[in-house]
A protein has these predicted regions:
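N-terminal export leaders
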Residues: 31-35
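Bacterial N-terminal signal peptides
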Residues: 38-48
Length: 421
């Protein structure tokens, strides 16, 4: 693990002691108030750093990883979240092992591409290593792309939602490794949305946003999910991936974890990540969740709802967020969830039901207007039942009954593959 957090915390210790001495010796009330503020800030920063420093991700544990790579040709599946301390994993390993190529998932190697944007192949300017995209037509490594590779290292930060596509990339990489007799090492990271909730993906709705028959919130790290994929035979044709997982140290299920790097352009902070499971299904509707603003997945609104809300936002084409957002250059009226005192935990239908009911008040053809991309909505949900139940006017508790039995079965299944308490 990088000694950067320790260095900073040592500096904070020194500054804290210095400020405390001045505070004690100062007779000025104004100075005391100011120094008290500075001292409190230092203590808060120190506590935050101490809490994060106790967690060692798989990539931080080079003492475990390097012996597994010695003398081997290595391919990496990484993006901008693949950090070893403050240094990218590729840069860390480049001078210590033979890296033959890098595979990049959705959003690209640097994590700056829009959702769904085509990613081109290229070459890393710093190391000269070829970079191959696993998003677009080629979502699975080809046999020719694994030629000369002995072991594949997978290190990407996930957010715990089934429709977040990094988990689908993991599935395809495992399948390719199994088919081509390659080892796979997963460098594990905590799950920031560590809940088990939502509908199980039905077979008819298998897609890149629903590759596996798991709940919308699966409650696993990618290391645990890799074990489940292997153990349940989901790779098909009796395939088994030669898998090793370097576990996270200092983290357990239910423990909050703030991501040090945003996992994708439109999940810029902890609030957006927490709301993502509940707001992402809006992508199958005519309601915006703030793409094209600097606060995506933190607001909800539509031009159609001017009569119901005072808060408004206007999606724009923004570099680094979204180039072509829904309702671009149109005022959207709705909710600012950044100001809400109480927000739902895990997955909730609260906002979907609220906005659909407002459309029903506004339009006789509310179903068509609201579910403007109904097929995409169903793929995100992994079932058409949620949409049908909403149209029938069912409450959230009534809708949840449809998946509760399957969810209980999944919870029992999940227990077999947990790597953490």
């Amino acid at each position: 693990m990088s000694d950067y957090p320790m260095l900073i915390s040592n500096k904070l210790h020194s500054f804290r002691n210095f400020a405390l001495q001045i505070y004690k010796n100062s007779m000025s009330y104004t100075k005391r108030i100011f120094l008290k503020y500075i001292l409190g800030t230092c203590i808060s920063c120190f506590m935050a750093l101490q809490g994060h420093a106790t967690v060692r991700n798989g990539a931080d544990q080079l003492e475990k990883l390097l012996p597994l790579l010695e003398g081997k040709q290595v391919s990496l599946v990484v993006n901008h979240t693949s950090l070893c301390g403050k240094t990218h994993l590729l840069d860390t390993l480049a001078n210590q092992v033979k890296i033959v190529r890098v595979f990049a998932p959705e959003h690209g190697f640097r994590g700056d591409a829009d959702a769904g944007e085509y990613i081109q192949n290229g070459k890393d300017t710093r190391t000269g290593v070829p970079i191959l995209s696993l998003y677009g037509k080629n979502k699975k490594p080809l046999p020719s792309q694994l030629t000369g590779t002995d072991v594949v290292v997978f290190d990407i930060q996930d957010v715990g939602a089934r429709f977040y596509t990094y988990i689908s990339t993991l599935y395809y990489v495992m399948q390719a490794c199994a088919e081509n007799q390659k080892e796979l090492i997963v460098l594990d990271r905590p799950n920031p949305c560590d809940y088990v909730d939502g509908p199980i993906r039905e077979k008819a709705y298998k897609s890149f946003v629903g590759m596996l028959p798991i709940p919308l919130l699966h409650g696993c790290t990618l290391g645990e999910m890799a074990g489940m994929i292997n153990g349940e035979g989901w790779l098909g044709k009796g395939l088994q991936c030669r898998l090793q997982v370097i576990r996270v140290e200092g983290w357990k299920h239910g423990q909050p974890y703030s991501l040090p790097v945003k996992p994708s352009p439109n999940l810029p902070n902890d609030l957006s990540i927490a709301l993502y499971p509940s707001l992402c299904p809006f992508e199958g509707t005519s309601v915006s969740i703030g793409r094209g603003t600097t606060y995506p997945f933190q607001v909800i609104g539509s031009p159609a709802l001017k009569d119901f809300f005072q808060f408004q936002f206007t999606p724009r084409s923004l570099k680094g967020f979204d180039k072509h957002p829904l309702h671009q250059n149109q005022a959207c009226f709705g909710l600012d969830l950044r100001t809400e005192k109480e927000l739902p935990q895990g997955f909730s239908l609260k906002y979907l039901l609220q906005f659909y009911q407002l459309y029903q008040k506004q339009y006789p053809d509310a179903e068509k207007r609201f579910f403007s991309r109904s097929q995409w909505f169903d793929l995100l949900m992994g079932t058409s039942q949620v949409r049908k139940d909403m149209i029938q006017g069912k409450t959230e508790s009534e809708i949840r009954q449809a998946w509760e039995k399957d969810l209980q079965a999944y919870r029992s299944l999940r227990e077999k593959y947990l790597l953490y308490e």
